[in-house]
Amino acid sequence: MRPIPRTMSTQHPDNATVPEWAKGDVIEGEAEVIEAYYAFSRLNVHEVMWDAEGKDVDTHVVRKLFSSFDEYFKNNILGEDIFLTYRLPNPKIEGAERKVFAETMESIPITFDVAERFYGRKVVPVFEVILPFTTNASDIISVARYYERAVAMEENIELQDGVYVRDLVGEIYPKRIEVIPLIEDKDSLLNTRNIIEGYYRAIKPSYMRLFIARSDPAMNYGMLTAVLLAKYALSEAGKLAEELGIPIFPIIGVGSLPFRGHLSPENYQRVMEEYEGVYTFTIQSAFKYDYSEEQVKGAISHINREEVKEPRILGEEEKKVTRDIIETYTLSYQPVIESLANLINTVALHLPRRRARKLHISLFGYARSTGKVMLPRAITFVGSLYSVGLPPEVIGISSLGKLNEMQWNILEENYKFLKNDLQKASEFINPEGLSTLVSYGYLDAEISKKLEEDIKYLESMGVKIGPRSYETKKHALLSQLLMLSLKEKKYNEVKQYAREMAVIRKSIG
């Protein structure tokens, strides 16, 4: 059995601070190749996700890593000791990226040829791909079959009498790849069992990896819903692994701020305890670059060494109650977000850009959708709300007042660190923010009342509201200045204040 990585470095653009080796504010091109090497060699991350979704991808990354850092990769075998995993565009959803999907798949045999020359033996450096927006088993079965039949088996095509493709390009390896479903929407996360089981029945892998989204579900349905969906999916995967008799290794996509998962060098131990059953944690850019390298390395080393706990398996009654809580919370959260969409999209334009990303216009492309409105990517969504002193963790929380005692007990058992996450976020509430937004015309008075109810409910839970430290007090003042600058159309100042606040938070969003 190949080693399964405990940590996966990603290219999420949530870092407020730019690393020293980046040549500008945006990490792109050759800098991302350097970043992959840095993650492996300096931070001791086990796996790097190479993102072909929503941006120009460099399919020659393996060749560049070997040629630039040959000594390191001679001693650390790519595909055996450390791992590079492609994140594909989903060809069913991102129509303009279909050929990028094909190009990325076609590059996998090239990486094999490069590695064979480099190591002097057959080494498969890339053999797993991640498919975003997976909604059913057919999605991932199609990707696995596409590689087998349209890439690996093209060597058998006869070009003319007795002349085959393999005579021109050589034999194609690997013959098959593993596909990791990245499950991002509520219905699909609740349907995790059928997605995994359908793939297993069709492909018969010896093990499976499952990628549970944490950011997009939070943006679309609220933080509490996202946590419960993750727990539900982990339970279903754990139960199915026992039934099928194959190991299933879940990955969770977590960022530094509570809304996006709260995995930071300061809070990683709680996150590992929260998400029992998770094998691989994403190490996103804010984790890597907004803390000291020593702190980052220490946290990653601890995650790499920590024993994996068994997932908590939910009983049928617990599953039903969890679904009920999810519906209650989501119904309270979504209407507020729809009302805030214009404000969020306006502020999002002025947040720092850290990666080269092609914005897509389609409903389920990179402009993400919740209900009836368009929203930016999750990172800028979160950053926008923090920048006006309204952390999204707060939104909809008063709906918990509708829960009975049994529902509360199940919630507390399945979201251990709810109060801790809310307390961290609540320090960034600007107590004057709501009245400022209403007076400037950015917030409807009715929605302001709903948000005030959420804040009062937090206080009833024993959560302290508003800034207490020098840094969080400074953050509140900067959010006031940002709102004033926005009103006066002084956009350079808006950008400056947004950047300063992101540095204080140690994450854009």
Swiss-Prot record:
Function summary: Catalyzes the irreversible beta-carboxylation of phosphoenolpyruvate (PEP) to form oxaloacetate (OAA), a four-carbon dicarboxylic acid source for the tricarboxylic acid cycle.
UniProt-listed Enzyme Commission number(s): 4.1.1.31
InterPro entries found in the cross-reference section: PEP_COase_arc-type, Pyrv/PenolPyrv_kinase-like_dom
Highest taxon of the lineage: Archaea
Catalytic activity: oxaloacetate + phosphate = phosphoenolpyruvate + hydrogencarbonate
Transcription regulation listed as a keyword: no
Protein name: Phosphoenolpyruvate carboxylase
Family named by the database record: Belongs to the PEPCase type 2 family.
Keywords carried by this UniProt record: Carbon dioxide fixation, Lyase, Magnesium
GO biological process: carbon fixation; oxaloacetate metabolic process; tricarboxylic acid cycle
GO molecular function, one term: magnesium ion binding
Cofactor(s) of this protein: Mg(2+)
Subunit annotation: Homotetramer.
